[in-house]
Amino acid sequence: MALVPYRRAALSAKERQHRRRLLSMTFITCLVLVMIGSTIHVVMLGRVRLGDMRNLATYDLAEESSRVRAAGEDLVLHRSHEEGRAANAGYAVVEAQQLLSREQWQDLDSMVRIPAGEFVMGTNLERADPQDKPEHKVALPTYYLDKYLVTNAQYARFVAATRRRPPSTWKDGRIPQGELMSPVTMVTWNDAADYAAWIGKRLPGEAELEKAGRGTDGRRWPWGNKMDPARLNTYYNVGSPNNVMAYPQGASIYGVFDLSGNVAEWTADELLPYNGATESPIAQGASGRNFKVLRGGSWKGDPLSTSLYHRDYAFPSHATDFYGFRCASNVDRVVRAQN
């Protein structure tokens, strides 16, 4: 008996549409069930995690005294470990002194005499920032200013002698390869002020930095009134702080290096408006802390920020890779040191 093959009747267009609708609904239902299951799983995990955290965060009051003692012991141990790590890292005093030759130390530690007299401070240029205005005259007595920015090598002597925490860019408390003669950075205003006091000097006032660069003719940059990228390190033309002796062609008429560019310099002064200013700069942060003035612009800044009249500012607790400093002194201290 011959078998007759079964042939399924062709579905009508209406039946095909109905089946597609059923398949779509089935897929959506499965997807929703999966999402619901995942959500329940996450919620359960969250409840378990919150329970663990609650157990860790709470304890019986009867145990409080023992826990307080344990916390105190932890603080003592942490402080001890920090001191031990500081003692085992970085430079010893003798080692820091041997980073450079005697001649190099003498050159780096040299100061330049800035004679007494009047100079032009600030500017009336329309495009200048409000805190830079107005132009006015200031008279200063004779003072001395570091010829160079304070270098990593010089700061290493301070760190070694005082066991101060080194800049965060120093790996294991040591200066990165090839940066002995670069200006120290990642230092706060307080770090800079403490270094200056340790070395027997002080931070310069912003007027002292400006006069050392502008001289008596009110120039915009240490070499004159025309911007010249070959005379300073700014606007990423080097890409990092560089040797403090790299730009003799950018020195001021008194012989001070890097008053424009390389790193912005902390000053002793708070940011306050000049007398006669029509607009007041932001002189205080939201927390009531005052800003400190920085001068000179940096390797990261635009060329206009290196204008000698420009006033930058930051909180004294702030540190970055384009802030540094130099020191100043009065005449009497320097004369005594030379005798």
Segments predicted by a language model, with ranges:
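Short glycine/threonine/proline-enriched tight-turn/helix- or strand-capping micro-motif at secondary-structure
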Residues: V93-L100, E135-H136, P241-Y247, Y309-D312, ...
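N-terminal low-complexity, Pro/Thr/Ser-rich intrinsically disordered segments
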Residues: V68-Q106
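A short glycine-rich, aromatic-capped structural motif
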Residues: M25, V32, S101-S168, V187-N190, ...
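Functional-site microenvironments in short loops/helix caps that host divalent-cation chemistry
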Residues: A10, I114, V120, N124, ...
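Disulfide-stabilized, aromatic/cysteine-rich ligand-recognition loop
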Residues: A2-A62, A71, H78, A89, ...
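Structural motif
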Residues: D109, E135, T142, Y254, ...
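Extracellular, beta-strand-rich glycan-interacting domains
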Residues: T151, A268, S329-N330
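Short, surface-exposed beta-strand/loop micro-motifs that present aromatic residues
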Residues: H136-K137, D146, I253-G255, P316
